[in-house]
Structure formats: C-alpha cells, structure tokens
From Swiss-Prot:
Protein name: Membrane-bound lytic murein transglycosylase C
Cellular component, GO annotation: cell outer membrane
GO terms, molecular function: hydrolase activity, acting on glycosyl bonds; peptidoglycan lytic transglycosylase activity
Lipidation positions, renumbered (N-palmitoyl cysteine): C17
Keywords, alphabetical: Cell outer membrane, Cell wall biogenesis/degradation, Lipoprotein, Lyase, Membrane, Palmitate, Signal
Designated gene of the protein: mltC
Membrane topology per record: Lipid-anchor
Alphabetized Gene3D superfamilies for the sequence: 1.10.530.10
Enzymatic reactions: Exolytic cleavage of the (1->4)-beta-glycosidic linkage between N-acetylmuramic acid (MurNAc) and N-acetylglucosamine (GlcNAc) residues in peptidoglycan, from either the reducing or the non-reducing ends of the peptidoglycan chains, with concomitant formation of a 1,6-anhydrobond in the MurNAc residue
Top EC class of this enzyme: lyase
EC numbers, comma separated: 4.2.2.n1
Length: 359
C-alpha cells in the first residue's frame, strides 16, 4: 500500500532535493544545517505536491523504494513488503515513453544506494550488469530479467497489456504495476547471507537474529531510509547506534551516509550494535533468552527504555529481570513497554527469528 504522507511527515526524510549533479546533492554539512534542511524540505515537498497533488505524495521509506525523475513527473515505487513495483507518470506528452524508460531502468538498476539520491529528480539510476531485482521479477514469459533487450520487450508488453490511468482531479496519472515473484523476500535475503555470516562470526551474534532484524527493519531493502534518518538494511542511525559502534572501535565521529548505505558496512555496524547491547548495555541480564528479548526491544527503542520498564535504576532493573522467567520478560516487554512500536517490534523480530532458525 502506498504511503500518502502529510508534509509534516516529509521533513525528517529529506536529504537532498537538488536537481543538479549528484556531487552537489550530498553535501552533508549543508544537510545538517537547519536552515539548509528547511530549504531542501520545502523544495522537495513543493515539487511533489504541486505536480502530483497532496494525496499523491509518495516518498521513500524503510520498505519502500521511491525514485522521481523527469522533473518529478515520473516515479518508480517498489514496495518490498507487498512485493509490487509501480511505475507512474503524470507527463502530459508521450507518457508511454516516460513509463517505458522508467520500467527498464528500475528493472535493471544496481544495488548501490549510495549512488542514488531518492530525494531529487536527478536521473542517477544506472543500468547494471547485475540488476538488484534479478530473480525477484520475471517477464511475461516467466524469465528473469538481466539484459536491456529483455527488459525493453517486457516494458512494451506491460504498456500494451497492463497500462492503467486515473485522475488526481487535475491531471491523468498513467501507471503500470509489476508483481514480484512469491519468494522475493528470500531472494533478497540470499544476497546478503555471506555478509551476515561474516558479521555473525566477528561479533558472536546469531545469524538468525541478524536476518530477523533485517527483515523487520527493511525487508532487505538496501535503499531503506526512515523518518528518524535510519539508513540501510539494518536501519542504523548515524548519531546514535552508528556513533556508539564507531566509539567502541576506536573511531572518531559518526559513520557517513555512504558508509551505511553500503550493505556490508551496514550489516557489520548493525551487528556490532547488537553485540554492544548484548554484552555491554544489557550484559547484566543472566538468562540468554531474556537478554535476547531485551536486546531486540532495545535495538528499536534503546536499552534505557527497556530497563525502565522494570525499574528506573538500571542495576535494579537487571536484578528484577533475573528473577523472572523468559516468558514473563517477553510478556512484560510486549505489554508494558511505553512504545507501541517497540512492543510490536519484539513480536515481529522474535517471530521472524523462529522462521530463520528452522531453515
């Protein structure tokens, strides 16, 4: 389902809205400046709403890839939860040509998020010899799509047989929707198994937990972003988890956006943070299962909020947890944690981890 967001929700997501070259859009010092951020937010929001209409504002999220091109008149939206790819255009002239170009580029794009600015209309999508969606989508003949010729033929088929249109009250929106293969989630997960195993061995974190976190955070979307500016597959926030991990590794500052958009670096950093939660912040919890529940919840809402569920005193909180059964700890965290998101998060990750343990 599309994300229709009010402008108030757009602001925290915007990183760059410049329509200039890519090198000009990722000036991180500029983005950190409040006034600069406001200008970028206003430009992006104004461009989208003015062209598409207020109820048609669709932006990227943890499980949604959204890329605008053609002066914001064309967009590609991959919903990694639903397994759908929707290509839309509001172009008044030759809409089929705009759709065709976007379909081909989306099907053949690579998996390097650091090279793509999701918050501008810069056409920075490059066709890759190893498309990110390869194996996750098949054409009308049931074949996976790797080369431009097959992608072009499939685009022509879609435009002839699946083209739809609707009105936003002012303009006609033309669209094509592609369903991904039923096991698209497993296809994406498989891409990162080697990186997950390496991080698991390095930090002593169970592979199944890493995979469960990745599934819950991003549905294995390497382009994932969020309103809290969490980035990448494991949704690492630069100034909190990222900074903590860097400090523990003797590094100064915080990881860059390009660093966290690199899948291997993101998985390494996210796993390192899980290890810190397990061994440092929540190391006073004796039972490994109880500690795992606490770590999962803390990955979403912080270790402090987990401990405060039991006591405002951190040491006392750990002591209380150590008197409880793992089942009681789970029940407490899923019913008494102040954040509804964190309560649901523990359930989701724990359920996902069980499925990965069975494989």
């Amino acid at each position: 389902m599309k994300k229709y967001l009010a402008l108030a929700l757009i602001a925290p997501l915007l990183i760059s809205c410049s329509t200039t070259k890519k090198g000009d859009t990722y000036n991180e010092a500029w983005v950190k400046d409040t006034n600069g951020f406001d200008i970028l937010m206003g430009q992006f929001a104004h461009n989208i709403e003015n062209i598409w209409g207020f109820k048609e504002v669709v932006i990227a999220g943890p499980k949604d890839y959204v890329k605008y091109t053609d002066q914001y008149q064309t967009r590609s939206h991959i919903n990694f939860d639903d397994g759908t790819i929707t290509i839309e255009t509001i172009a008044g002239t030759e809409p089929a040509a705009h759709l065709r170009r976007a379909i081909i580029k989306t099907l053949l794009m690579g998996d390097d998020p650091s090279s793509v600015d999701l918050y501008s209309d810069v056409d920075d999508i490059t066709i890759s010899k190893e498309p990110f969606l390869y194996g996750q989508v098949v054409d009308n003949t049931g074949q996976p799509i790797r080369w431009e010729g097959r992608a072009s033929n499939f685009a022509d088929y879609l435009l002839k047989n699946r083209l739809k249109s609707r009105s936003n009250g002012l303009r006609i929106i033309y669209s094509v929707t592609i369903n991904m293969v039923p096991n698209h989630l497993d296809k994406r997960a498989h891409k990162y198994l080697g990186m997950v195993r390496q991080a698991s061995r390095k930090y002593g974190v169970d592979e199944s937990l890493i995979l469960a976190i990745m599934q819950t955070e991003s549905s294995f979307n390497p382009y994932a972003v969020s309103r809290s500016d969490a980035l990448g597959l494991m949704q690492v926030v630069q100034n909190t988890a990222g900074k903590d991990v860097f400090r523990s590794q003797g590094k100064s500052g915080t990881p860059s956006r390009s660093f966290l958009f690199d899948p291997a670096s993101n998985i390494d950093t996210g796993t390192a943070y899980l290890a810190m939660l397990n061994n440092v912040y929540l190391g006073g919890i004796d039972n490994p299962t109880s500690r795992r529940y606490a770590v999962i919840t803390a990955y979403n809402g912080g270790a402090g909020s987990v401990l405060r569920v039991f006591s405002n005193d951190k040491i006392q909180a750990a002591n209380i947890i150590n008197t409880m059964t793992p089942g009681d700890v789970y029940q407490t965290l899923t019913t008494r944690h102040p954040s509804a998101e964190s309560r649901r998060y523990l359930y989701k990750v724990n359920t996902a981890q069980k499925s990965y343990r069975r494989r």
